[in-house]
Amino acid sequence: MKALNISIFSLLSSFILFNVAALIIILNRNKTTFIIKHGINLLLLSSLLAFIRLILPIDLYNAKIIDIHRIYKPLKYFLVLKIGNQLFIYQFLLLLWGIGTVAFLFYYLSSSILEIYKLNHLNCIPCPTLETLYSNYMHPKVIIKISPEVDVPKVWGFYKCHIYFPNYMLSPDEWKFILAHEVQHIKLHDTFIKMLLLFLIALFWWNPIMYTLRKNIDQMLELRCDSKLAQNYSLEMQNKYLETILKVLRERNTSSLTISKKNLTASFVNHSAYSLTRQRFEMILNTKKLNKNRTFLCYCITVLLFVSSYFIILQPDEKMTTEPGPTLILHTSPNEYKLYINGTFSKNLTPNEVHSKKYSKYEIIEGSN
């Protein structure tokens, strides 16, 4: 017998457990105290494990079964209803899922290509200050462009990365902060993460929680960049870094440029997410350090919960049930009778016992050995 399998019930279990995990992640992402106490990487790890649980719906044979017979029975009745003469509802839903996935993949692919095309055809201008900073420590496979058509600093790329800067009046230190932030996005491979998120959203386009989780993961990536930078900054530099965020936000709010799409790019600020900006300030100004032992324990518990989730499956409990056999007396020979109770042989009876009051209620069936 195989140790594991994939069934409709393992898919259902994965979907439900993913949604539960996603809701917990979203709720805790909005709690600054939780992030300060446990770190943003715990939420990112939880998000990764939640997605793995969703796309690997393994059904273990020794998993604990949670009986959903009462839910499954009417659901099954609904799914096997026919639409017309040949198409069942479940077939229609699978067809709709497939068409939707193809449509969303096409939409995200085309909009991402258009986004990158527009960025690569910007009207660029020189910026000596930024170019000097760039030449000091940037990797040669990173391309920098400055353009008045860019609304906020942003970055994208895999093998060769591109950083785009707006034509803002900023000091060398402010440009340095922005440059360092965008370089962090490159080092942490955030474009690749965003691309995977787009694929998963296209695959599970019918699940509204996916869109909310994607938005929160985007914000977590910004918080992670801030955390990486701030841990090496002095208090004075942290304050200047926050002042730079505010200055870029003010510049963006006074700009007449339309908000650009951000399917693959990661930007320095999000002018429409006030709560995120406030959270960035609270985290950078926080003076408490993470407890490494507690953080490691939280990681272990998270991984343990992920592994243990495979030992739970939601499905109708298929216990073997047998209908009880008949209770009767079988006449096998002139002086031999056999008593069967619930279909199971009990004992032999004599003719006197058979006709006694005790056994008179049982039917006598003529038979043979």
Predicted feature residues:
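Extracytoplasmic catalytic-loop and juxtamembrane helix elements of membrane-embedded
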Residues: I65-L75
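Short linear regulatory motifs and low-complexity interaction segments
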Residues: I312-N369
